[in-house]
Amino acid sequence: MEFIVIIPARFFSKRFPKKPLININGKPMIIHTIENAKKSGASRVIVVTDNNEIYSLVNKNGIEVLLTKKEYNSGTERLIEAIEKFKIKDNQIIVNLQVDEPFLNSDNIFNVAKKLKEKNLIVSTLAIPILNKKEIFDKNIVKVVIDINGYALYFSRSVIPWCENYNSYYIKNNFLKHVGIYAYYAKFVRLYSNYNSSKLEKMENLEQLRILWYGKRIYVSVENIKNCFSINTPSDMLNIKSF
């Protein structure tokens, strides 16, 4: 199975400026993410960025990189410029891997692409069980609820689903944390770029809600992955000490 991993790397994040370049165990975060992508079996790994410093670092490490010319509302919108620049065909599987997922292992990256093809999906993504009450109420952790067939009903920074009981057993079996990775065909990315932003997307600041808004379905694979956490804010760096 052939797939391309594209990593959007925005420099000026409101919650964590210069995030792609932060040092994690002696290497910039973006290099960790790239290395995992390379190990996944991807035929190509491409970085798209709005910053010259990131561009130079990635280029120095021998990875394809595109310096984007425009401001975008989301990483998915940024992908379209890479797809057009590199003349990627409509039937090519694209894995959109968020730069702030440096601990997502190569097998999980591969499996998101594999699910897309095997199940003939429009969009494939990943979630892991939430294990503690603190994560449920953390707005930087995106929650997802799914239907009986594994398709997303909604993504939110708020507590979903709401309940009265937050004991550890109930939390572990009822709450899911979304992981920043998507697989889809290049044709769908082109379609997505033609959709206007939805009001829910703007309210929650979650690009995947645009997909649901326009009636498309997102399949969510639920995996029990240890030590899988994203770097959203400076405080998340504290998790690395226990990693």
UniProtKB/Swiss-Prot annotation:
One of its GO terms (molecular function) is 3-deoxy-manno-octulosonate cytidylyltransferase activity. Keywords: Cytoplasm, Lipopolysaccharide biosynthesis, Nucleotidyltransferase, Transferase. Its EC number is 2.7.7.38. Pfam families: CTP_transf_3. Transmembrane segments: none annotated. Pathway: Nucleotide-sugar biosynthesis; CMP-3-deoxy-D-manno-octulosonate biosynthesis; CMP-3-deoxy-D-manno-octulosonate from 3-deoxy-D-manno-octulosonate and CTP: step 1/1. It comes from the Bacteria. It is an enzyme of class 2 (transferase). GO terms for biological process: CMP-keto-3-deoxy-D-manno-octulosonic acid biosynthetic process; lipopolysaccharide biosynthetic process. InterPro entries: Cytidylyl_trans, KdsB, Nucleotide-diphossugar_trans. Activates KDO (a required 8-carbon sugar) for incorporation into bacterial lipopolysaccharide in Gram-negative bacteria. NCBIfam families: kdsB (TIGR00466), PRK05450.1-5 (NF003952). This is 3-deoxy-manno-octulosonate cytidylyltransferase. The lineage of its organism: Bacteria, Pseudomonadati, Pseudomonadota, Gammaproteobacteria, Enterobacterales.
